[in-house]
Design a protein with these regions (language model features):
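Conserved N-terminal catalytic/coupling substructures associated with nucleotide/phosphate chemistry
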Residues: 1-144
């Protein structure tokens, strides 16, 4: 898939940010996956799960959906290079009460520009069980 094809796909499937969809640039996931609370991937996953579930698109510019790609080359889990499967496992490990059912990371790498985009599909929290990240239940206030 070319970068243009991927951008068209993203625009058709995830046309705008809303309560169920967030776009994040995160050019380098090494310090962004489980990093500063509130600004890292696990905090966003918690917040989206605690609404109705949805999608986190990583590797695109906020507001424009321009593909910038994300670098996972220095991201490791337990000393092993990260991939979509190990990142999914890490999410369930770091996000208390996050259901693995419906949780999925879809990975796209453009053929022409070699840019990587991850789409994290996030299930809704279980009844009376908010999803925690950094021992807190996150919520998307601006989307209420």
């Amino acid at each position: 898939m070319t970068e243009l094809d991927l951008q068209q796909y993203l625009l058709s499937e995830y046309p705008q940010e809303n309560a169920r969809c967030e776009w994040k640039e995160y050019k380098n996931l090494k310090n962004s996956f489980c990093g500063d609370e509130k600004d890292d991937v696990i905090s966003y996953v918690s917040a989206i799960a605690n609404m109705e579930g949805g999608h986190l698109v990583i590797g695109v510019k906020d507001k424009t959906l321009e593909i910038v790609g994300t670098d996972i080359s220095r991201l490791t889990f337990n000393g092993q290079p990260a991939n979509a499967q190990s990142a999914t496992f890490k999410l369930t490990e770091q996000c208390t009460y996050l259901s693995s059912e419906g949780l999925n990371i879809e990975e796209f790498v453009t053929d022409d520009t070699n840019k990587r985009v991850w789409i994290i599909h996030i299930p809704k929290h279980l009844p009376r069980r908010p999803v925690l990240a950094h021992k807190k239940a996150w919520q998307r206030i601006e989307d209420l």
